[in-house]
Curated annotation (Swiss-Prot):
Residue numbers spanned by region Disordered: 1-25, 116-138
Protein's GO biological process: attachment of mitotic spindle microtubules to kinetochore; attachment of spindle microtubules to kinetochore; cell division; mitotic sister chromatid biorientation; protein transport along microtubule to mitotic spindle pole body
Subcellular location: Chromosome, Centromere, Kinetochore; Cytoplasm, Cytoskeleton, Spindle; Nucleus
Any one Gene Ontology cellular component term annotated for this protein: mitotic spindle pole body
The protein, known as: DASH complex subunit DAD2
Role played: Component of the DASH complex that connects microtubules with kinetochores and couples microtubule depolymerisation to chromosome movement; it is involved in retrieving kinetochores to the spindle poles before their re-orientation on the spindle in early mitosis and allows microtubule depolymerization to pull chromosomes apart and resist detachment during anaphase.
Biased composition (Polar residues): 1-14
Gene: DAD2
UniProt record similarity statement: Belongs to the DASH complex DAD2 family.
Lineage, highest ranks first: Eukaryota, Fungi, Dikarya, Ascomycota, Pezizomycotina
InterPro entries documented for this protein: DASH_Dad2
Broad class of where this protein is predominantly found: nucleus
Oligomeric and partner information: Component of the DASH complex consisting of ASK1, DAD1, DAD2, DAD3, DAD4, DAM1, DUO1, HSK3, SPC19 and SPC34, with a stoichiometry of one copy of each subunit per complex. Multiple DASH complexes oligomerize to form a ring that encircles spindle microtubules and organizes the rod-like NDC80 complexes of the outer kinetochore. DASH complex oligomerization strengthens microtubule attachments. On cytoplasmic microtubules, DASH complexes appear to form patches instead of rings.
Record keywords: Cell cycle, Cell division, Centromere, Chromosome, Chromosome partition, Cytoplasm, Cytoskeleton, Kinetochore, Microtubule, Mitosis, Nucleus
Amino acid sequence: MSGFSSRPLSTHLRQPSLAPPQGQSPALLARVNEKKAELENLKELRDLSAAVAAQMEALEQKLSTLSSGTEAIATVLANWHNVLRAISMASAKIPEPKEETEENTVPLPQTLVRIPTEHAPALQAHAEGATEEESGRG
């Protein structure tokens, strides 16, 4: 006689069932339900994490736009001292009236002229180089 069981093979394999078998213990059913709830929570967490990641990417794009805008504002503010200096120089050279012709006229500053600035970086570098040479001599 062989050492194998004479029972049919199908009784040795577990049969998957969609409905819970009648003989399962309540503790096992509670654990299965707990794991199902945990799976649902993990799926919700995954979806929420994906939403947060998308919002962070949008925030990154907005911050890069803000950063480039800040650089532009810094450039404009860095040039204001030149504008104010030009206005101050023009205001300092207000001509004194030679004759008291009209008492109601207000002396105006010198006329300011617009100069194209396409070569401004090269001119500024040249002016800074000349300033450094003069300070090196002194």
